């Protein structure tokens, strides 16, 4: 858990998934096998570390994503986000929704609200450190319907059931504190927080997050 929270964002989704089966009577052999697979992955990548750096000017950028109804047992959705400053990730999260969501757009809105809340806190923190963003931080999402709802400032009959408190991203955009932008799924870094990926895609996103070999001799194939 410490690694997932502090230095290994690539562990966020698998540990979030396994945490759902920690309660007595819920875990089965398949979950134990999955936990051992995570440990094997961690041993083979123990030389990986999160490296921060990049531009001289602080630029805060975020990605948010949701995987709709990926938990077949509860019909709930996985949601995640990541924020980076320069070339490294400074904040991330992977979580299952607290309720059943009616559409992929709704799941993306909930993920966007969660990310917007973290973005607001990071903006306050940077301001206190004397590094207030010079322009609205960009939050990338891959659902165009969610982006349109936040830009058009209106609700339709298909979305008016969504609690208004989840339109935090829209409110911040109206205030000029956030800019929503579209990103294709293949380029959305938050994908690694919502679903299992092919090894090549997983490695590519790890590099984007800032996870690079820091102790090369500890890496195994």
Predicted features, each with a name:
Residues 54, 64-66, 85-87, 141-143, ...:
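Residues immediately flanking
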Residues 62-105:
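RNase H-like nuclease fold core
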Residues 21, 59, 95-221:
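RNase H-like nuclease module associated with reverse transcription
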Residues 40-66, 131-133:
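Structured nucleic-acid-interacting core domains from mobile-element enzymes and related host factors
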Residues 14, 37, 63-72, 83, ...:
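Acidic, metal-ion-coordinating active-site neighborhood of RNase H-like domains
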Residues 1-13, 67-71, 75-78, 104-124:
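Conserved pre-motif C helix in the palm subdomain of viral-like polymerases
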Residues 1-48, 184, 192-194:
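C-terminal reverse transcriptase regions that engage the nucleic-acid substrate
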Residues 44-48, 69, 89-92, 121-128:
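Conserved helix-loop functional segments at active or binding sites
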């Amino acid at each position: 858990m410490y690694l997932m929270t502090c230095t290994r964002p690539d562990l966020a989704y698998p540990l979030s998934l396994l945490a759902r089966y920690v309660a007595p009577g819920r875990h089965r052999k398949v979950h134990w096998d999955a936990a051992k697979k995570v440990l094997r992955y961690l041993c083979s990548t123990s030389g990986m570390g999160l490296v921060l750096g990049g531009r001289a000017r602080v630029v805060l950028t975020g990605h948010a994503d949701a995987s709709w109804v990926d938990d077949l047992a509860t019909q709930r959705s996985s949601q995640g986000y990541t924020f980076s400053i320069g070339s490294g990730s400074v904040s991330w999260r992977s979580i299952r929704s607290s309720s059943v969501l009616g559409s992929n757009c709704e799941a993306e809105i909930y993920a966007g609200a969660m990310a917007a809340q973290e973005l607001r806190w990071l903006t306050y923190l940077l301001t206190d450190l004397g590094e207030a963003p010079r322009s609205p931080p960009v939050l990338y999402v891959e659902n165009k319907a969610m982006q349109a709802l936040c830009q058009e400032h209106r609700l339709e009959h298909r979305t008016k059931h969504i609690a208004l408190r989840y339109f935090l991203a829209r409110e911040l955009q109206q205030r000029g504190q956030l800019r929503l932008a579209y990103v294709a799924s293949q380029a959305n870094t938050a994908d690694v927080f919502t679903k299992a990926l092919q090894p090549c895609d997983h490695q590519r996103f790890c590099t984007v997050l800032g996870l690079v070999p820091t102790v090369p001799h500890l890496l195994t194939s």
